[in-house]
Every structure is written in C-alpha cells, then in structure tokens.
Amino acid sequence: MHLVGGAPPEHPEPARPKPASRVAMLSMHTSPLEQPGTGDAGGMNVYVIELARQLAALGTEVEVFTRAVSSRLPPALEIAPGVIVRHVPAGPFEDIGREELPAWLCAFTADVLRTEAGHAAGWFDVVHSHYWLSGQVGLSAARRWGVPLVHTAHTLARVKNASLADGDRPEPEPRVQGEQEIIKAATRLIASTDTERRHLTQLYGAAPGKVDVVAPGVDLDVFRPGDPRAARKRVGLDPDTQLLLFVGRIQPLKAPDVLLAAAAELIHRDPDRRGQLAVVVVGGPSGSGLERPDSLVKLAAELGITDIVRFQPPVPQEQLAHWYRAATAVVVPSHSESFGLVAVEAQACGTPVVAASVGGLRTAVAHGTSGVLVHGWEPADYADALERILTEERWRRHLSTGARLRAASFGWTATAKGVLASYQAAISPAAVAV
C-alpha cells in the first residue's frame, strides 16, 4: 500500500490473492437437478444448486460435475448465467445405490479430468467437493490441477453410526477411512454449524484453523409467510384442518414413523380431534421409485389412523412452500442432521417446528422461540409438544413470529459470501496445499 505524497513503505504488503473466478463443484452421487425427496436427493441437492447460482450472481463461475443417470441428458447444461451442470458418464445410466458408487470413482474422476483438459491452463481456481465420494474425486482433481480443495461433508459416517435408527445400516468402514483421508488432505473444510465443526475436529482430528462454519441458506423469496387457510385450500385440505407435516426422504434416519405414532397418541388423548387432524408425508423412499412407502402405510393401519394420513410425492419448491404455509406444525424427528434445511424452510414460511434435539437442528431451531426441540424419539414427547401448539393459539403465534425471525438470517447471499471467504483462505499462499 502506498501513501499519497509519501515514500513507499520499506516492507510492502504482499499481494492479495486474486478472487476465485472459476470453481469446479463436485456432486457425484446426486444431481442438483434432481427433485429433493426422491431417491438420494435431499437438502444437499438444494444446497449445491442454490450455492452455485448465488456464487455466479456474485461473479464466480461454477461448473458442477455430477454422474449421468440417463443417456438422454446433455453432456453440459447451462442452468443459469455462469452455472453449468456437466453430466459425467460413470456407471450405468440409471440411479444406483450409494454403496455401489465407489466402484465408479475412477471412471468419474477420469472424465472430470478429461473435461478440464479441454479448458485453458489454470481454468479452475478451486475445487469444491460435496460428500465423501466427491471428496475422493476432489483429491485427485486438485492435485492434478495444482489448486486447493475445499470440502463440505454434509454428513459424517461416525456421527451417523453413533445415532442409528432401528432398521438403519451402519456406514461402512471404507467410508470412514475415505472421510478421514479427505479431512486430513483438504485445504479448507466447510461445516454447517459449530456442532459439525466439533465433529470434524474431535472425531476426525481436523485442524481447527482450517474449518470454516458457514450456515446453509434458504430462498426467502420462495419460502415466505402466507395465509394458512388459503394454503390449505390450495393443497386440497379443509381450511380448518390442523395439519402436521413431514417433509423428506422416507428412511429410518428421518424417523417419519415417530410423527405417525405421535399423531395416534394425540387422537388417543382426545378422540374428537380425529375430525380436525391431518398428517401429510411429503417425500419418497430413499433409493426406491415407490410413491408410497409400504412400511408407513402399514404403520398407519396398525395405529388406526389411515383415514387422517396422506402421502404426497415430492414437489418443487414453489409447491412445497404452500405445504409449509398450510401446516400447523412441521415435524423433523431425525436421528441425525448436519443442519436441517426443512426446518429453516418451514420457519421461513412462519410455521413452528417440532424437531429432535440433534446435530444442526439445535442451530436451525431456537427452542421455545421458533419451535420445540425434543430429546429422544418417544412419540408421547412429540405429542406433548404438538398438543400445546394445536391447543394454545397464543403459544402458536409466538412460535410463528419467532420462526419468521429465525429464518430471516439464513439467506443464500450470506452463505455464498461465507463460502467465497473460505475459497479466499484456501487460495492464500499461507494455506496448506492438498
């Protein structure tokens, strides 16, 4: 820095690294273009596509590499100015389970490297990998291109294995080892919450100084408050219905069965409530094309609540916002969540959330202000929290107001700026190379 009218300093400041102008974003196992709530598509899909769009809006071009699941997909598709999704042929042109994908890592990596070879030298400034499979690809790509690797885990095997639900399979040891390798070698790590940061440092030995906490965002233009009665009519419900809503993939980890059991408990306590209550599950089974998960259909029958339970296939975000606005409460009883995007989307619509007190849900939901956090998975405890919301209008309005205020701080612009800061730290000469 030079002072006007004076001599230059004896020891000039080092030049600042140039901003990241192009980023290779890796999302091997799930395309950001897939409908969340189907197969393995979920909050990470929303994260990748919204982050890419916002980064481009701030001046950073993004190329997202994802596995091609159909021969009809174009090799490259520009989905927004500055955002290209590249469909990489690796394995069969169909959805396959995540447990089968490690066999196709080499093929995916080779095609990513081949694509970059068609660009000018030094095309990408940063590699940003999402989930451990992409992290393995990112290690190779970053080393080949001589650029830093920034990694976002989204979920961690050791955390999931410590909180398995009944019927869940533990994550395999190769995943644990793969995550360990990525966390050690990555230039920067992005965690969604302070809790995830602690998991990275305490369970995987990540250097605290290279972990950046950047909360995911929510589209506050799409997910916004509205008239609940009008929203209920729009989704085909009576305006006076008290709606309990679950949104997400149907799998033991997400515990939708807890909501069904809690609803049955509410009716047991007050049989007259049956005519007012509705339970809607918006989502599809993980890794299956079934429209309705058989296990939940059977559970509803066993609990005697088939008449009040409705299964809704996954819907686009604009339609999902109507469901959130229609709900009296959104229930998120997951056994593990690195953040809990559904909880924030619901709160942005002014809907109170009843969630498990685990992981990132402790950050997403302000207990007693925007919703209620429940310890454990006893249906009666969820019924207690829901009963108060259903019966005490003043309490429900208090939580609704708090929900809107809570969600207001989770915009995608803030997320993108935080991620850009992590990129800059990775590019800095002081950063540790991959």
UniProtKB/Swiss-Prot annotation:
Keywords: Glycosyltransferase, Magnesium, Metal-binding, Transferase. Signal peptide: none annotated. GO terms for biological process: mycothiol biosynthetic process. Residues 1-21 are annotated as: Disordered. It is an enzyme of class 2 (transferase). 1D-myo-inositol 3-phosphate binds at H29, D40, A41, G42, G43, M44, N45, R98, Y131, T155, R175. The keyword Nuclease does not apply. UDP-N-acetyl-alpha-D-glucosamine binds at Q35, P36, G43, R249, K254, V315, E337, E345. Mg(2+) binds at Y324, R325, A327, T351. Its EC number is 2.4.1.250. It catalyses: 1D-myo-inositol 3-phosphate + UDP-N-acetyl-alpha-D-glucosamine = 1D-myo-inositol 2-acetamido-2-deoxy-alpha-D-glucopyranoside 3-phosphate + UDP + H(+). Belongs to the glycosyltransferase group 1 family. MshA subfamily. Catalyzes the transfer of a N-acetyl-glucosamine moiety to 1D-myo-inositol 3-phosphate to produce 1D-myo-inositol 2-acetamido-2-deoxy-glucopyranoside 3-phosphate in the mycothiol biosynthesis pathway. Homodimer. This is D-inositol 3-phosphate glycosyltransferase. It comes from Parafrankia sp. (strain EAN1pec).
